[in-house]
Amino acid sequence: MNKPYTKPDYEQELRRAGVRITRPRRIILNILNETEDHPDALEIFRRAVEEDDSISLSTVYRTIKLLEERGAIHRHAFAGGPSRFEQASGAHHDHIIDMDSGDVVEFHSDKIEKLQEEIARSLGFEIVHHRLELYCKKLKS
């Protein structure tokens, strides 16, 4: 999916907030910045040790917690699996979760967004935030 936005420089934002950017944190930030999938903590750990085998799983968990607290990443708890993560930047999108493979596909639909707004408004509400997850199986050819 082409993303028509520039990802913010979370490293600079974290520095301004007084967070030390260690080599492991930089590696983990880069993994989350460059990925198009939604890795779980173990996958982030696997990718991190490819770059620096001194990074521990506990370092990954602590860094994820810090990044989440600072608003740099979003945690997704898709049904039937571990928490998965993505950078918090960018345009709003929803997710399709392939129930067979666990793959996550991002999508955006103006029709769906408009319909949600209409439904909320008709019931006397204004949407502040929402998250749409569609659990699907691939169509058979």
Curated annotation (Swiss-Prot):
Disulfide bonds: none annotated. The keyword DNA repair does not apply. It holds the Pfam family FUR. Zn(2+) binds at residues 38, 86, 95, 106. One of its GO terms (biological process) is regulation of secondary metabolite biosynthetic process. Its main location: cytoplasm. It is found in: Cytoplasm. Homodimer. This is Ferric uptake regulation protein. The gene is fur.
